[in-house]
Amino acid sequence: DMVTRTLARREAVQSSQIEGTQTNLDELLVFEATLGLDGLPADVVVTERYVQALQLGLDAVRARGREALDLTLVNQLHAVLMQDAADDFPKGCYRQEQAIIGPLGGRPEDARFVPSPPDRIDEGMRELERAMLK
């Protein structure tokens, strides 16, 4: 329905901005209507991936209910979000290197957020899955 579609796109814009994209809702809607980047920021393609991932997740939950909320779905969503990333980036897989959320090339102590180290991701994701399925 129209309300869900609009809210999904607003969420996609806001979520992608966490990653540093510079797209607004109007630009996303124009891109979807025209399927072209003419006069739009390239980031709109990234933001559209968020829409696709959200739709995939919603469809899975509608089809299977809460049981859809498992690590297979999380990895599928990640693969959608990262499909335009560099070829050596593991799409739908957990990272093997420490990541930071902050300035490009920045140090962990200057980061806005430092996620769990790679050796703790499997354990954390299993905990997340258990919590989602409760």
Predicted regions and their residues:
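FIC/Doc superfamily catalytic core
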Residues: 1-134
